[in-house]
Amino acid sequence: MRLSPHEQERLLLSYAAELARRRQARGLKLNHPEAVALITDHVLEGARDGRSVAELMASGRTVLTRDDVMTGVPEMIHDVQVEATFPDGTKLVTVHQPIA
């Protein structure tokens, strides 16, 4: 199986998000890379499902709370920007202050 660099990046991100979900299910608090992976995966999958940019910008802020992540992580993540493929093309989705 041959994957383009873009496809490899998406696959790695998807795996990182899955690992974060498993750790979260075990009751562990997520670190910075895990939190970003989970939010990014939420946006990418939402775009794939046909949700709008505005909808994903809003729902991206509900993926994680301060209780879900390690101390200091919310302050480290000001914005998460994701280039997602929608049915009508590729768009940049910015989730501002994603961890409330």
Curated annotation (Swiss-Prot):
Alphabetized InterPro entries for the sequence: Urease_gamma, Urease_gamma/gamma-beta_su, Urease_gamma_sf, Urease_subunit
EC top class named in words: hydrolase
Cellular component GO terms held in the UniProt record: cytoplasm
Compartments, record wording: Cytoplasm
Keywords: Cytoplasm, Hydrolase
Presence of the UniProt keyword DNA repair in the record: no
Record EC number: 3.5.1.5
GO biological process: urea catabolic process
Primary localization: cytoplasm
Recorded GO MF terms: nickel cation binding; urease activity
This protein's pathway: Nitrogen metabolism; urea degradation; CO(2) and NH(3) from urea (urease route): step 1/1
Reactions mediated catalytically: urea + 2 H2O + H(+) = hydrogencarbonate + 2 NH4(+)
Keyword Cytoplasm set for record: yes
Coiled-coil spans in chain: none
Assembly and binders: Heterotrimer of UreA (gamma), UreB (beta) and UreC (alpha) subunits. Three heterotrimers associate to form the active enzyme.
Family classification: Belongs to the urease gamma subunit family.
Name of the protein described by the UniProt record: Urease subunit gamma
Native organism: Nocardia farcinica (strain IFM 10152)
Gene for this chain: ureA
